[in-house]
Amino acid sequence: MARVKRGVIARKRHNKVLKQAKGYYGARKKIFRVAKQAVIKAGQYAYRDRRNKKRQFRRLWIARINAAARLNGMTYSRFISGLNKAGVEVDRKVLSDIAVHDAAAFSAIVEKAKAALA
């Protein structure tokens, strides 16, 4: 059986990992064994945080809606309850954007929610 020398393939594999580790600090960018571990860990963080990002944005939207609702004399939970009773189907992302960029329109939405609760 012929002998298989893996020099070219191993070098390509190493360079691929080292390229992914570009920008890392110290040995994490220079030494293959350390760089490989760093790249794997970075992938785990990226996977986890792609999911956490969705939670974080929802929390941000809710905080913004709550602040704007309180400026109009209403709490977040009563506001959302009023919207559901009024049949207003606007998601939190859009409500947050309206609250930040168009206070008058948000006040009108709050009035609809108040009317539905009364």
UniProtKB/Swiss-Prot annotation:
InterPro entries per record: Ribosomal_bL20 (IPR005813), RIBOSOMAL_L20_CS (IPR049946), Ribosomal_protein_bL20_C (IPR035566)
Gene Ontology MF terms: rRNA binding; structural constituent of ribosome
Superkingdom of origin: Bacteria
Pfam assignment, any one: Ribosomal_L20
Keywords: Ribonucleoprotein, Ribosomal protein, RNA-binding, rRNA-binding
Gene3D superfamilies linked to this entry: 6.10.160.10, Ribosomal protein L20
A Gene Ontology biological process term: translation
Role, per record: Binds directly to 23S ribosomal RNA and is necessary for the in vitro assembly process of the 50S ribosomal subunit. It is not involved in the protein synthesizing functions of that subunit.
The protein's name: Large ribosomal subunit protein bL20
Species for this entry: Hydrogenovibrio crunogenus (strain DSM 25203 / XCL-2)
Gene behind the chain: rplT
